[in-house]
Amino acid sequence: MDAKDILAALQDEMGQEALFQKADAVRAKHCGNVAQLRGVVHFSNYCCRDDLYCGLRKSNPDITRFRMTGDQIVDTALAIAEAGLGTVVLQSGEDSHYTRQMLCSIIRRIVAQADVAVTLSLGERPIDDLRAFRDAGATRYLMKHETMNPDLYARMRPGLRLVDRIRTIETLRELGYQTGVGNVVGLPGQTDADLAADIVFFQDFQPDMVNIGPFIPHADTPLRHEATGDMDRMLRVFALARIVTQNTHLAAANTVATLDPDNGQYRAFVQGGANVIMPNCNPFLKSKTDKIEYEFQITTKKRYVSVDEAREVLRRAGRDAAPGRGDSLKMRGEYHD
C-alpha cells in the first residue's frame, strides 16, 4: 500500500468493518489461529528520560519508585516458564543502575535454567551493551519508535531525536535481534498523516514484532488534561499494520486493556489482527504469603492483565495459545513482498 491509500483507509470510519475483516483474514492466513502468550517482568520504573506522556518520567516526584533485585527478576522469569509461557519480556525504564554485567548475568541465569526466549525492552543502551546482551542469550528487543514525525517526537521526548532512535532500531537488527517497534496512537498534535507514516514505516522495515498502544493521559505529567486516544482509530492502525506486515507478531498491549478493560484486547484480536498478548507477571511472589506489588505507572490506573485473564481473552477470540517460544515468523523466509 502507498501512503495515500493508507491514509484513506485510516480516515474511512464508515469502511472500517471491511478493513477489520481484511486484517483478520491476513492474520489467519499468515499467523494461523494461535496466539503468543508472553510474560512481562516490569523490574524497574526508574527512568532517566523525561517523556511528556509517560508516568515514569524523571520529573515526576509523585511516583513510588522500585527496583527488583537480580534474584527477584530471575525467580519471576522462572515462574513464567513454569506457567508454560515460552517468552519472558524484561522491561524497565531507562535505568543505568542495572549495569551491563548485571543484566548479562540475569539473562544467562534465565536461559541456563529455562527453555524460554528472552525479550528485552530497556530503552536505548550503548551498542556494546546491546551486543553483550545478545551474546548472553537475549534474542529479541522491543524498542517502540513512538512516532515517525520528527518534530512531534522531539516535543514529546525533550532532548531526543527520532533519527537516533531509528538508528538504534536498525542496529538491533544488525546485531541479530528479532526486532520490535511500535507507536502511540492519539498523541497531542498527532495527525492522521503522522499515523500513516508510522504504518509506512512498518511496511518498509518489516519488524519481527509491532506493539501499538493508545495515548492515555497520566495525572502526573504535563499532558494530564489532554484527550485520551480513540479506540476505533487505534484499531484501524492495528488493522493496517497487520495488512502491510502480514506475518509480523502484533501485540495487544496492556494499555489497550486500560482504554477498554472489558473488550479492548479482544477487539484487537478479532478486528485488529493481533496475535500476541503479554500478561503482566508482577507482583513478584516471594512466597505464598508475602506479595510485593510493583506498579509500573506509565499511565494512570493502568490495567494489568494476568496470565489467566490473557488466556480468557484468547478463549473469547477463539485462539489457542501457541506452544514453544514463538519466534519471529519472518525467520521462515516469509518476508512480505
Q: Each predicted region: which residue ranges?
A:
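An N-cap/entry alpha-helix motif that binds or orients negatively charged groups
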Residues: 2-36
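Catalytic cores of alpha/beta
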Residues: 126-133, 188-202, 258-272
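Active-site-proximal loop/turn and secondary-structure-junction residues that shape catalytic pockets
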Residues: 41-43, 94-96, 122-126, 147-149, ...
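Conserved, mostly hydrophobic/aromatic
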Residues: 23, 51, 90, 143, ...
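Core AdoMet radical
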Residues: 58-76, 80-101, 107-169, 178-185, ...
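Auxiliary Fe-S-binding modules of radical SAM enzymes
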Residues: 1-14, 209-337
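Canonical Radical SAM [4Fe-4S] cluster-binding loop centered on the CxxxCxxC motif
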Residues: 31-72
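Alpha-helix-loop-beta-strand connector modules within alpha/beta enzyme cores
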Residues: 98-122, 160-180, 225-249, 302-318
